[in-house]
């Protein structure tokens, strides 16, 4: 289990709070009006192969996708220690700063069909968080993210980080989702292929 997902959000107050991804909205997205679209940029680790992504993950599972909901995530910070030990020590974050650093996410419920690796159980449901979604009439789009609910496949292979308290996200938005067709697995349409592993059977033997 990961101790904490850690993304960096840059807010109006220019305080930087360490929460794996670095995320910031585009500079002109300050106060978007209802009906507008805001593009969010995020940096994720890249693995270059399915095998490397699987090795980095806490859980690798085949799932059926269920309903989703919108959520707002706020950065958390640790102000313990001295200024030299911890750059967050002594940083005064106002409610306005915290609101400016909030990130819109889509949280999707998935049902576990098969466990390739990890501690999850077949038949259980978990929630997977992805950047982007809609909030107050504004659509937020993270450029490399394909929301689970939009993928046209009855089953998906998800390569997940576990942050505890039932919180999961993909190791990255492109390499963390694979389309399942029978025993075969493939990258999302438009995503460069990582052909080192092409089937669930190969994954089972590897795990």
Residue ranges with predicted function:
Residues 2-14, 22-35, 96-98, 122, ...:
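Netrin-like (NTR/C345C) domain of secreted extracellular proteins
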Residues 71, 116-118, 166:
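Short beta-strands and strand-coil junctions in structured, solvent-facing domains, enriched
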Residues 71-107:
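Mixed-charge, low-complexity intrinsically disordered segments
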Residues 2-59, 67-84:
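OB/S1-fold single-stranded nucleic-acid-binding modules
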Residues 45, 55-62, 103-107, 121-125, ...:
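Extracytoplasmic
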Residues 41-51, 86-97, 136-147:
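N-terminal post-signal-peptidase region of extra-cytosolic proteins
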């Amino acid at each position: 289990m990961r101790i904490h997902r850690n993304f960096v959000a840059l807010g109006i107050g220019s305080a930087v709070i360490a929460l794996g991804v670095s995320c910031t909205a585009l500079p002109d997205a300050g106060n978007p009006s209802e009906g507008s679209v805001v593009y969010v940029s995020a940096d994720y680790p890249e693995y270059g192969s399915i095998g490397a992504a699987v090795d980095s993950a806490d859980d690798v599972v085949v799932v059926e996708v269920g309903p989703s909901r919108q959520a707002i995530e706020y950065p958390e910070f640790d102000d313990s220690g001295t200024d030299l030990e911890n750059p967050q020590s002594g940083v005064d974050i106002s409610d306005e700063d915290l609101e400016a650093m909030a990130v819109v996410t889509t949280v999707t419920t998935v049902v576990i069909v098969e466990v390739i690796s990890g501690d999850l159980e077949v038949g259980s449901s978990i929630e997977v968080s992805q950047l982007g979604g809609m909030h107050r009439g504004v659509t937020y789009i993270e450029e490399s993210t394909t929301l689970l609910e939009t993928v046209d496949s009855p089953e998906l292979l998800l390569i997940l980080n576990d942050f505890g308290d039932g919180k999961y996200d993909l190791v990255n938005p492109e390499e963390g989702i694979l389309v399942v067709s029978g025993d075969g697995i493939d990258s999302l349409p438009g995503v460069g292929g990582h052909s080192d592993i092409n089937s669930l059977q190969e994954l089972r033997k590897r795990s």
